[in-house]
Swiss-Prot record:
Protein name as annotated: RNA-binding protein Hfq
Species the sequence originates in: Xanthomonas campestris pv. campestris (strain ATCC 33913 / DSM 3586 / NCPPB 528 / LMG 568 / P 25)
Keywords carried by this UniProt record: RNA-binding, Stress response
Sm domain: residues covered: 9-68
Lineage of producing organism: Bacteria, Pseudomonadati, Pseudomonadota, Gammaproteobacteria, Lysobacterales
Known role: RNA chaperone that binds small regulatory RNA (sRNAs) and mRNAs to facilitate mRNA translational regulation in response to envelope stress, environmental stress and changes in metabolite concentrations. Also binds with high specificity to tRNAs.
Domain of life where this protein originates: Bacteria
Amino acid sequence: MAKGQSLQDPFLNALRRERVPVSVYLVNGIKLQGTIESFDQFVVLLRNTVSQMVYKHAISTVVPARNVRVGPGGGYVQSNENNQAEDDDVEQ
């Protein structure tokens, strides 16, 4: 498993499992909203009134509507008022 996947998959899985509403910002500035239905190595399936398959290489930022705990013993990821994700409890 690549090092970049060690946080990405648990984060997306927590959002999917808990059905947390998210705002997904694309690299071209477009904002998509919905819940994560599924994901794999290359795409995220985002559900709102319709399902959209969004390629991960087009995603800039994923902002959850509320705090989410990532993995066992992991930290909380929360969204702030500036639409940026913050990590409160990650060891460095």
